[in-house]
């Protein structure tokens, strides 16, 4: 049987991968957005694991709010990536400071 500790270890590994991806890759904006989403999903997994362990639905309801914010963040982030690519022809983070208007 898979216990609470297994879910928490998996969540910690996913969180660590997301943070490591942010620190390792600082140039590609799309990879940075994917790492942020990985971090949010790791946090959601921990909320679900604790919610199931404590038999309380508050954690699962909170996950829906986090998913809503993550979807909005992804949509805005991808819109910025598309605008950056159309204007500059690349999706490097260094090109963000040159966007004006």
Curated annotation (Swiss-Prot):
It is an enzyme of class 7 (translocase). Gene3D superfamilies: 1.10.287.3510. GO terms for molecular function: NADH:ubiquinone reductase (non-electrogenic) activity; quinone binding. Its EC number is 7.1.1.-. The keyword DNA repair does not apply. GO terms for cellular component: NADH dehydrogenase complex; plasma membrane. It catalyses: a quinone + NADH + 5 H(+)(in) = a quinol + NAD(+) + 4 H(+)(out). Pfam families: Oxidored_q2. The chain crosses the membrane at residues 4-24, 30-50, 61-81. It is found in: Cell inner membrane. One of its GO terms (biological process) is ATP synthesis coupled electron transport. Disulfide bonds: none annotated. The keyword Transmembrane applies. InterPro entries: NADH_UbQ_OxRdtase_chain4L/K, NUOK/Mnh_C1-like. It is a multi-pass membrane protein. Belongs to the complex I subunit 4L family. NDH-1 is composed of 14 different subunits. Subunits NuoA, H, J, K, L, M, N constitute the membrane sector of the complex. NDH-1 shuttles electrons from NADH, via FMN and iron-sulfur (Fe-S) centers, to quinones in the respiratory chain. The immediate electron acceptor for the enzyme in this species is believed to be ubiquinone. Couples the redox reaction to proton translocation (for every two electrons transferred, four hydrogen ions are translocated across the cytoplasmic membrane), and thus conserves the redox energy in a proton gradient. HAMAP family: NDH1_NuoK. This is NADH-quinone oxidoreductase subunit K. It comes from Alkalilimnicola ehrlichii (strain ATCC BAA-1101 / DSM 17681 / MLHE-1). The gene is nuoK.
């Amino acid at each position: 049987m898979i216990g609470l500790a297994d879910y928490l270890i998996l969540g910690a590994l996913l969180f660590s991968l997301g943070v490591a991806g942010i620190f390792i890759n600082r140039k590609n904006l799309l990879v940075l957005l994917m790492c942020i989403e990985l971090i949010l999903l790791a946090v959601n997994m921990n909320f679900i694991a604790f919610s199931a362990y404590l038999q309380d639905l508050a954690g699962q309801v909170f996950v829906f709010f986090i998913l809503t914010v993550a979807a909005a963040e992804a949509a805005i982030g991808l819109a910025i990536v598309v605008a950056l690519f159309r204007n500059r022809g690349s999706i490097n983070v260094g090109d963000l400071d040159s966007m004006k208007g």
